[in-house]
């Protein structure tokens, strides 16, 4: 199995050929929540419209590199627009724009898993009890769940060879648990990898078992600390990951087995340049669906001045 880490931009994955990937599993950056560092990062200090359209460039690239008939799985949660930034609370359903774009780009939406978890990021605005407690009317729901959106690229998928098919057989208990509409397991603790948005290995592990065969290739365009690559390695799949911030490379290499503990691990690290603003604007104009926010939220303050918008604590070698 081979594992390729590209220090580069998911909006233009030049190192991944057309229809060469069998599954995409990812969790994109939140909007205005954390400064992930690196030129070309998506979500921090962007307008909501720019954030959605930059994500759409990545989803368009995912469609290009996916084999026909294969799955794109996106872990995303709703977010609050915080009153400290915008003057009022409002839930932002990011998933609705992802579904709208992916359907327009040539995916079928195949439903969603609702993942109930203890969140690793303060998507509710940073408080345990929100709203008018202890009095009615203005209480605010706690966002202790996220969605795993499932899309299928149109067309006929490649046929696995008999040995890979047999090696990928699932038990009836696995099938019933994984293909249920609700999952319940905890998110990864922040202190374990010091990457604040990390998801647990169980999440990509389930999706890789559900939607790929042994020996196939899994892509994560927002690799982060490398959890999807770890799950792919442990399940006998090859993997490719794009990550804009090279500071995550030491922990990614350890998860991929480049520390020498796993003799069969072949890890390649490539470099690519981030998409510049002009090229990104041109690419957006070519999208099948360009998002325009009908009711823009006017930002009252710069998130870089608040702790909610601080830079993440990076993994150190």
Regions found by a protein language model. Name each.
Residues 1, 234, 253-268:
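Short, conserved SAM-binding/catalytic segment
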Residues 1-251, 284, 289-292, 296-317:
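Core catalytic lobe of class I
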Residues 7-12, 269-277:
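Conserved SAM/SAH-binding loop
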Residues 24, 236, 250, 262-263, ...:
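Compositionally biased amphipathic helical and low-complexity segments enriched in hydrophobic
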